[in-house]
Every structure is written in C-alpha cells, then in structure tokens.
Amino acid sequence: IEKIYSNGYEKSMIVQDYIPGDDSHMRVLTCYSDQNGKVKMQCLGHVLLEEHTPKGIGNHAAIITEYDEEVMTKFKNFLEAINYTGYSNFDIKYDARDNKYKVFEINLRQGRSNYYVTSSGNNIAKFVVEDRVYNKELPLKIQKEPFFWRCIPKQVVYKYVKNPDLVKKCKELDAAGKSATSFGYKADLKGNFKRSSYVSLYYINQFRKFKKYCK
C-alpha cells in the first residue's frame, strides 16, 4: 500500500480480507429480475476451475450447477427488496473458516461464463424478450438439476480439479449427457475447417496454459 501511494495514487483504497481456498470454493449466481422487480430465474454454479493465465485469472473455466435453497432465497429477497430489474451476476466464495459464503460483488450483466446458464436450460435471451417485448408474466425458474459446463477440455478439468468427488461428479454428468462446452456448437463446426482447426488449437493451448500457470 505504501508503494502504491508513493507512486502517485491519491484516492482511497478498499482493503479486503483474503478468503482462503482453491477455485472450487467459488460460486457464481446468475439471476434475471423482470420489469416489476421480481426474480424470475436463478442459476447457481459451483466453480470447479478458473483460468490461471495473467490476463485471464479469475474467469470461470468449468462449472457444475447446483441447488442451494438457503443461498438462492437470500439473494432473491435482496434483489426484490431493492426493486432490481434485469440481469445480475454474483461472485461468491465459501469461507471454510466460519462455514459461510462471502459475496465479492454484483455484476449488472451476464457473466463471461454465462453459457453455464444457457446450456443447463435457462436461455436468458428468452427471459428478457418475453418480459420486455411481449410483457408476459413469467413463472419463477430455478435451476435445480446438476449440469456440467466447461470452456476447456474435460481432461484438463479432471486433472486440475483437486477434489476427487467433484471430478467423479463431472464424469458422471458427462456420461449421462448432462454436459456442454461453449465450443461444441455443431452447426459452427460442421464443414467449417477453419473453425474446427481454431477450436482444436484452442484446446491444445489450454493443456499448455494450465501446465504452466495452474500450480
């Protein structure tokens, strides 16, 4: 902090407690609140791995959706109490020191890893169109079934996720067809050599990046 201020920074700083735990202690919650401030969709994700490159650190790379009624109800009540409308995306971390979840921030948008929401059956584009364009009264949709999403090769997930129970769950979901990758859209890949080559190189590169940066 002294070095920061001695180099010309003059404004206030917020000092935040470091919460211990690897990537799998992270959670991400995506919600949609309609034009009347009522929550109409919630999808909670248990983060398995994040990116570890200097530029990408903190971005979610693999997620399993999960249902936690207590946590999701608290956020629903908060959003409705402030009459929030639109997308909201919360970064949360489980603190093993007191067995509580700590909220880092609310993003007033969908997250970079939002395909974990769409691929698990919650098309957020449909929610906003039906709410804002067609003025429909939407039912509350809460994601309860587990679904495995990733934007990296599943072999990377299996290798670098430290919790064997989570790895086992990933493999079970994948075997059951309850998994998806952001780079697996068949219409993009079929007959498209350039796109297929890019995706293949991207995946190969992920093995190299995790080997170098994920310690």
Where in the sequence are the language-model features?
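Conserved protein kinase catalytic/activation segment
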Residues: 99-101
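Conserved ATP-binding module of the ATP-grasp superfamily
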Residues: 1-22, 54
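Pre-DFG segment of protein kinase catalytic domains
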Residues: 103-105
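Peripheral (often C-terminal) accessory segments that flank ATP-dependent C-N-forming ligase machineries
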Residues: 130-215
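Short acidic alpha-helical/loop segments enriched in Asp/Glu that coordinate divalent cations
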Residues: 91, 116-118, 141
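A short glycine-rich, hydrophobically flanked beta-strand micro-motif that places a catalytic Asp/Glu
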Residues: 15-17, 85-97
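Short, basic and Ser/Thr-rich N-terminal targeting/leader segments
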Residues: 9-11, 23-27, 86-88
